[in-house]
A protein has these predicted regions:
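Acidic, glycine-enriched catalytic cores built around paired aspartates
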Residues: 2-310
Length: 310
């Protein structure tokens, strides 16, 4: 229901690079249950109750002097953004530089809404135990599409998630609007967490933070390329050119050096063109209206120009 809000709570410029790579979970929100809980869920869906549970067994070390070591009933699936690991769920999308306060606010509010909905049903129930079983089965039936125990990095999962109707929000700029949807305003307003104005102000601040971060990165890249990389390459091409001339004067074959010179000169030309493009779009971005318009320009124009130069 609130996958877009969870994704937004973990959004920052650095996470745009991290999610889906570098030992990080993908940007698609799903839940990994593992074999043990998955077995319980399947029992509940098929019969309405769980009568047994899998266990992890013992670790066979082959050393008789060591005591028995119990194994987890499941692995930890590092490709899942929301995974059950032994006795808890882990929300792994938050970047290392970010505070967990924001994601905790979102998680706790979503859980509060779920508890409130359950209470509305159970408080009116004539038979509490029967109502609990029915409610659990209903929730699992309605939301089992978010359960995925496979490889979250695979292209197959991206296609499968699309079939299931799960959002794949790839960037911070595309995630921020989740804060100000009618659904989000109703959720946070119901529990007096944030007003509509407070959500809008937070969205505006996030847009500005994104724009500032990308602007700093772009200017740093321009500075590095213009003052360090290109001058170093120019110096090296001069050395290669001198070498080619010297080898030819000596009557030897200079084809290897000449080929290297041609390749590097070509790359230097491409680098200079990419640098000029980045300089132009960065300057253009500075003139855009601050907030959503500017941050979207940074994401869809400046970031690709940075990738081109990189």
């Amino acid at each position: 229901v609130h996958a877009d809000l969870l994704r937004e709570s973990a959004a920052d410029p650095g996470n745009d690079h991290r999610l889906g790579a570098n030992e990080a979970p993908p940007a698609i929100i799903s839940i990994f249950l593992g074999e043990q809980l998955q077995d319980v869920v399947e029992q509940l869906l098929s019969t309405g109750e769980a009568t047994h549970s899998l266990n992890g067994g013992k670790l066979q070390t082959g050393v008789t002097t060591l005591p028995d070591l119990t194994k987890d009933a499941t692995d930890r699936n590092r490709t899942s953004p929301f995974a059950f690991t032994g006795n808890k769920f882990e929300f792994r999308m938050v970047g290392s530089r970010d505070s967990i306060a924001g994601p905790n606010v979102v998680l706790n509010t979503i859980v509060a809404e779920a508890f409130a909905e359950a209470c509305d049903v159970l408080e009116k129930a004539d038979d509490f135990d029967t109502a609990v079983h029915s409610l659990i089965k209903e929730y699992l039936t309605d939301h089992q599409r978010i359960i995925f125990n496979g490889n979250g990095y695979s292209d197959e999962w991206v296609a499968e998630a699309e079939k299931r109707g799960l959002p794949n929000i790839k960037s911070m700029v595309e995630a921020i609007p989740a804060l100000t949807t009618d659904k989000a305003v109703e959720l946070f307003g119901k529990f007096s967490v944030f007003t509509k104005a407070e959500l809008e102000s937070r969205a505006e601040i996030k847009y500005e933070n994104y724009a500032k971060a990308i602007n700093i990165e772009a200017k740093a890249m321009i500075d590095i390329a213009a003052k360090q990389i290109i001058p170093a390459v120019v110096k090296y091409t001069k050395e290669l050119a001198d070498t080619v001339l010297a080898v030819k004067e000596a009557g030897a074959d200079a084809s290897v050096q000449a080929e290297m010179l041609a390749d590097i000169s070509g790359l230097l030309t491409e680098t200079k063109a990419a640098l000029k493009k980045l300089e132009a779009v960065t300057e253009e971005a500075a003139g855009k209206e601050e907030g959503k318009v500017q941050s979207e320009f940074y994401h869809f124009s400046v970031v690709p120009a940075m990738e081109g130069l990189r």
